[in-house]
Amino acid sequence: MTILPKKKPPPPDADPANEPPPPGPMPPAPRRGGGVGVGGGGTGVGGGDRDRDSGVVGARPRASPPPQGPLPGPPGALHRWALAVPPGAVAGPRPQQASPPPCGGPGGPGGGPGDALGAAAAGVGAAGVVVGVGGAVGVGGCCSGPGHSKRRRQAPGVGAVGGGSPEREEVGAGYNSEDEYEAAAARIEAMDPATVEQQEHWFEKALRDKKGFIIKQMKEDGACLFRAVADQVYGDQDMHEVVRKHCMDYLMKNADYFSNYVTEDFTTYINRKRKNNCHGNHIEMQAMAEMYNRPVEVYQYSTGTSAVEPINTFHGIHQNEDEPIRVSYHRNIHYNSVVNPNKATIGVGLGLPSFKPGFAEQSLMKNAIKTSEESWIEQQMLEDKKRATDWEATNEAIEEQVARESYLQWLRDQEKQARQVRGPSQPRKASATCSSATAAASSGLEEWTSRSPRQRSSASSPEHPELHAELGMKPPSPGTVLALAKPPSPCAPGTSSQFSAGADRATSPLVSLYPALECRALIQQMSPSAFGLNDWDDDEILASVLAVSQQEYLDSMKKNKVHRDPPPDKS
């Protein structure tokens, strides 16, 4: 700030017309020309207020609105020495305008208000004040979004002679960042929708191909900036209200710094920004960069080599290696979140101790893999049990089928051998008897083999080979081992009267048909475990039933033979 010295008083012999006016309030100047006003919004960017006691220009207190209305003229005021106009120097009225009038006037060079305005501009401009006429002196930039030209807005004239009209004052007074959206809306209306869509597509493709970033769309409701930051920090854009509240609280706590960048009343600005539908701009970005201690990078569509480089970066107070908060700026009015899918950034900047980005996702992945493996192992064990059960059932069915076929084959072989030994002279009754016995034995075998094939399999190897030698029977082949597990034949009834006498035993057709049945009594006296038979009691009942049936069949055959024999010739 430049402190201007006081103007020295003129010597006593000076022209009284050039003497400064006496102390006290100065009457308003005639509305003949544009006045000079010291305005601006208390931004500390060149706007200032005069010191009423010292007569020098000082800094305006922060967070205070610009003064309205004419300023009184105490001694040492700025306009006392800067705007002193000799009486009668103004030749005529001058129309009000927003730019300084040309120097000089009808009253002669150096004698009109032009010279005074030039001197005022030269003196006040050194303090950083923008001088205007008829409306006029405005300082301080207005907030705009990234990519906007930060044009300065003119505040209404204060303490001006012949200030601007009320319409101009109403237009000049407004929000600190309203020009951002006014200019953006005008630009959007002027752009072709097809061109905008094509640019957005190219922008998204360039970020994905060159940086590997993905643009995540945010809801367009005025809180898009806070939604994008919430998505970057919390992973959920619906937490934008929390982000906005923290940001506004941070701005209020640091009002002595951030108020320098606001042209309106800072408290009014904060209260307006607390609304959920109010847009955010670069002041909030800087606050959030400091609040989360993460840089904020803003990407926007552009041409050339900088198409995928951030157009603006806001840094925090402390430098670190954390991933920045990335947002994209679209159509000069909307923000989206730019996500790096290869690096986790959620939770960074929240001040959580020992927090590692992505560690929660890794733990969840490990738990999911472990659960999946356990489920897969249990499923495989169940499938193995099912396959094992089917294999056992298949083996039992195969063993049962082999035992049945082996026993039937043994019966066929024995019948064939008996036919060869019997010869053609044997009666037909023996063949019929053996056939019926074979059928009965087959039916009895099916019932017997339908029980437990495992018990029969225990006798796969003969435990008494000497028994086969005594009986005159050769051991069966391995394929017919199970067929010998039931030695008693149904053709040999245990209660038949034909075996009661020793003489009948030699001439019986059953004995001649089955020579091995002579040892039936010996075999029946042996333990069933020798043949692998544990259900011997059931077999005895079956054998007795078959014996009774055989006896009835033999009796019927004898009766038929008696009826068929012709009566003897009496002649």
UniProtKB/Swiss-Prot annotation:
PANTHER family: OTU DOMAIN CONTAINING PROTEIN, OTU DOMAIN-CONTAINING PROTEIN 5
Region (Variable-loop): 273-283
Stimuli inducing this protein: Up-regulated by bacterial lipopolysaccharide (LPS) in bone marrow-derived macrophages.
Tissue expression per record: Expressed in various tissues, including the liver and placenta, as well as in peripheral blood leukocytes.
Annotated disorder: Multiple congenital anomalies-neurodevelopmental syndrome, X-linked: An X-linked recessive, congenital disorder characterized by central nervous system, craniofacial, cardiac, skeletal, and genitourinary anomalies. Clinical features include poor growth, short stature, global developmental delay, impaired intellectual development, microcephaly, hydrocephalus, hypotonia, congenital heart defects, hypospadias, and other variable abnormalities. Brain imaging typically shows ventriculomegaly and thin corpus callosum.
Residue numbers carrying Phosphotyrosine: 175
Sorted UniProt keywords: Disease variant, Hydrolase, Intellectual disability, Nucleus, Phosphoprotein, Protease, Thiol protease, Ubl conjugation pathway
An example molecular function term from Gene Ontology annotations: deubiquitinase activity
Subunit: Interacts with TRAF3.
Biased composition (Low complexity): 84-97, 430-443, 450-462
Protein's recorded name: OTU domain-containing protein 5
Annotated region (Disordered), positions in chain: 1-111, 146-175, 418-502
Consequence the record notes for mutating residue 494 to S: In MCAND; decreased mRNA and protein levels; no effect on cleavage activity towards 'K-48'-chains but not 'K-63'-chains; in mice embryo the mutation is lethal; no effect on phosphorylation
Stretches with biased composition (Pro residues): 11-30, 63-75
